[in-house]
Regions:
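N-terminal [4Fe-4S]-dependent radical SAM core
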Residues: 1-93, 101, 302
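Conserved AdoMet/S-adenosylmethionine-binding subsite of the radical SAM
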Residues: 76-247, 254-255
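Auxiliary Fe-S-binding modules of radical SAM enzymes
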Residues: 1-19, 43-46, 50, 170, ...
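Generic preference for flexible, low-structure residues
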Residues: 34, 40, 47-50, 110-112, ...
């Protein structure tokens, strides 16, 4: 069957995050500087959340371990947020669970089915799901309903030289699991790109990918992205007909080039980028349009809401 796209060309989408589940735990090197940890810690001190829920659900999501703040491996399901996309009539690109992982073992199949039911019904929206837990993604794929408006992605942070063999195999397996996945549109996040991308990585059937260097509030803690890793990744994508985008060059690059001083702490401003990378810069997810994907994806018109290249990217990280 021909793959189907759900977008109408005339739609103008906005972007939102739908954090119906929050909380996580580390699975690979790409998690080491995860922005969700300080964000959950920040939210735990928000009095408005405490006032609304009686207690602050974020309080239990992080803990101090070996003198550092880390995930506690506990999760929280915000049932009151479940219907949010159904109440939003304007077509929106929703990044699902930016402070968690949809396929974390703490997210029950029952909760997953309820989340998918909302996404299935809200077919005037796009839902981007990004995971590092491709094994559970694969295990549950036939137990969930994959309407064309649900895009599935995996994170591939590259293969650092010091990555243990067991972790290396798991990271590589994410791509093979995604290739076989039934989602209508499939994508890869090469962010944070902290190691080389194997030249024999098979991206058959992957529709698009975005690349990004690691961002961090502290210059010395941000791991650098080698420009050659990025160039090799772009060339690999193009060889498979996978549309590549570049989100940012990372904090280490911004510091090395002096852009840190100009508040571009993640290397998102593409004006000072190497010239060959500028054409791949993405301003936002809204730029990933049917026109971009048309060579790969056929596109009938689907749901409407019920009545009642150089710059800064707002794509999800890692």
């Amino acid at each position: 069957m021909t793959k189907k796209m759900f977008l109408k060309n005339e739609k103008v989408y906005r972007e939102q995050t739908w954090n119906v589940v929050v909380g996580c735990s580390r699975v690979s090197a790409g998690c080491d500087n995860c922005y969700a940890i300080p964000e959950c810690q920040r939210m735990s001190g928000n009095p408005k959340i405490t006032q609304k829920h009686g207690v602050n659900p974020y309080d239990k999501l992080v803990q101090i371990r070996n003198g550092k703040t880390d995930f506690s491996s506990k999760l929280h399901f915000f049932e009151d947020r479940l219907s949010t996309p159904l109440r939003v009539k304007r077509p929106t690109i929703w990044f699902v669970n930016s402070l968690s992982d949809m396929y974390h073992h703490g997210v029950s199949l029952d909760v997953l089915k309820r989340i998918f039911e909302v996404m299935n019904r809200a077919d005037w929206h796009i839902f981007d799901i990004l995971t590092k837990r491709a094994d559970r993604m694969e295990e549950l794929s036939d137990k969930l309903t994959w309407t064309p408006n649900i895009w599935q992605g995996v994170t591939f942070e590259g293969i650092p030289a010091d990555m243990p063999d067991g972790q290396r195999k798991k990271v590589l397996s994410r791509i093979s699991a995604l290739r076989e996945h039934p989602a209508n549109v499939k994508f890869v996040s090469f962010e944070p790109l902290i190691g080389a991308i194997p030249p024999d990585l098979d991206l058959t059937g992957i529709d698009w990918a975005f690349f990004g260097g690691e961002s961090h509030r502290t210059i010395l803690q941000a791991r650098p992205m080698e420009p050659q890793w990025l160039r090799d990744g772009i060339a690999l994508c193009e060889s498979f007909g996978c549309k590549p985008y570049v989100k940012q060059l990372g904090t280490a690059w911004a510091a090395a080039t002096g852009n840190w001083r100009f508040k571009d702490k993640a290397g998102k401003d593409s004006l000072p980028w190497p010239e060959d990378l500028c054409p791949y810069a993405i301003h936002s997810l809204r730029e990933i349009t049917p026109d971009d994907l048309r060579p790969m994806v056929a596109q009938p018109s689907l749901g409407d809401p019920p009545s009642s290249n150089c710059g800064h990217a707002d794509t999800p990280e890692g």
